[in-house]
Amino acid sequence: MSLSANISVEAPIENQIQEIAYDGTEIYQLPPTLSEHLAKCATKIDFSKTSSDIDLLQQSIKKEDEKKEEESKDPKEQFQSSLWPWDSVRNKLKEALTEVCVLSDVLNIAKEKRYMVLDPIPQEPPEVKQMVLVYARKKALASAANILQSGVERLKAVQSDQGVSRSNSTDFHIELLRLRRNWRLKKVSNTIIGDLSYRTAGSKFMHPGMFEVTKAEDEESGSPPASPSGSGAAGTVACPKINSALRVNVPTELQGVAFIKVITQKDQEDLCTATVNMMGSTQLVPQAGAWQQTLEYAQNVLFCKELFNQLAREAVQLQAPIPHVVVGNQIRATLLPGIQLIISLCHSTSSDSNNSSEPIKDHDHVLEHSLHQLLREFHHKNTHHPFPHPASGPLGPSKKRMLAGPSAYDRHELLEMTKSQTLLEQIIAQAQHIFTRRRTQYVLDTVARDVKDPMITSHWNAMNSPTMSCVKINITSHGYDANLRTSLVIHVKERSLKCICRDGRIMHMSYEPQELRDLILCQISQHQIVCLQNLAKCMAWQILSSSSHLGIGSVEPLGNASSCVLASPNSDRLIAVQVRCDSQIDVKVFIAQSPAKDFFPGSLVQGRHWEHLGGHFKEVRFDKMEGKNFHNKMEFLMASLTSQS
């Protein structure tokens, strides 16, 4: 029985599918006949190994028989068999059951002839409706499609998870490359360290300005909770809403937003306010990443701290008439009597405090730009030293000092070259100039508003230096511009004014606004008299006398009055004009007639020629005269007094 082989005599339930047509029809492959199956099985037999296999089987049978004999000789087995007396009965019943089963199978085979047929018997195909077949195939295709789609979704999810895990490192290196283009990085051991300081630009600030670059997943897994004080990590300032493969960790003292506020106060009233903030625009660069704004804010904090530290150190070292005061994050310096310059460092680690603060009024962008330029220039001087010319000359002196010998500079010029101003002195000088310029603008505007005749126009030069401005003032009369135009130029400096008149006179004034106002009123008075004289010449009137500083009459509160005396072409009419230098530009006009009608010869004066001395001057009610302005009224008056003869 051990050498018997199992032979399948049953036909397969289904035939193999050879092809499926486009309409869903399945073409089955016919089963092989008995001879084909026998030939196929015969090809699988290796007759070269049959003898060796038989020998191996015989050897294995002998070994089994020997083992059985040894087991039968074992006393333990004998003892156990004695313990089971029904063992022989069980074996006999089992053999009888096997024989009965075999007999039953033989009878069934003999009774049913189909079991003896090796070739399949063709049966009549059952009638199947086409619609049922189509519906069944569609249902089978739909179930197969659902299985395929679910498999595709699972594969897609797996691939996306694997892609994210693989792309994290790729995105990290790409963003690290972008970070390296804009910021200085170096690798120390297993960490990446960046530099925010301005040391390469010439800064000598002691703060290291370092930041650490880490992967996003590393930081998310080990990030500490936010502190109750409101100061979060640097990466959480601008990066929580933007996915990024890397995170930057800046020091605690560089977190948040910082700016420097400069205020000019007079009696607790803000005259000028400016803020220093390097963030010109808070929009992120698309190629940069979520870390760009964080680093810009941190560098802005470092910049403001360096600037304030430099100003505070200079404020302590400078010896001013009124000492500068440094208290905490505030520096107080005196610009002018009663006017203070307050420089404050404002540093906020809360992102909401900056947004909730009210906008600063009267923002001075010029002072803000100047503070930037001063620190940039300070950095530039630390790294850029003038090269000697010729090359064999000493290293260090500037080109101007090298030309001192050939140019024969005196001691005063050499001392001027050695002087240099600190950042605080330059800021104070610029603040003084801004305050003086605002005062000058206010005086010019108020005088132009109060004085209607003549017209005053101011032209400020657009190309100015931080400590000096230039304004040109034109005084003209409406309708008589070609007759006379009085011009004067004023140079506005830090604490003084320099006025250059049309005739070349130069006058120096202090920062007090009243001095400039008095000067303009005097120029208006002289303009009225000079323009009247030019008008009289055009109308053939004679100028008998003229004075820009009349020394007779009552004492004027401001300067001296200007006056002139005019005579008609026939000398029969006289006009005396007096212009006072007050806020209203008071004008008085007197007329006289020659010869005098009330002249009577007497015992003392008997000659008729004395009648040409003129009579008494009578004042004209100038405000009641017709005319647009002073010169128009004087033109009408001279025209009416001119004799027809």
Curated annotation (Swiss-Prot):
Mind telling me what this protein is named? Answer: Mediator of RNA polymerase II transcription subunit 17
Chain positions covered by the region annotation Disordered: 215-234
Biological process (GO) annotations? Answer: regulation of transcription by RNA polymerase II
Q: Which GO terms describe its cellular component?
A: core mediator complex; mediator complex
Quote the subcellular location field of this record.
Nucleus
Family to which the UniProt record says this protein belongs = Belongs to the Mediator complex subunit 17 family.
What's one GO MF term for it?
Answer: transcription coregulator activity
Lineage here is: Eukaryota, Metazoa, Ecdysozoa, Arthropoda, Hexapoda
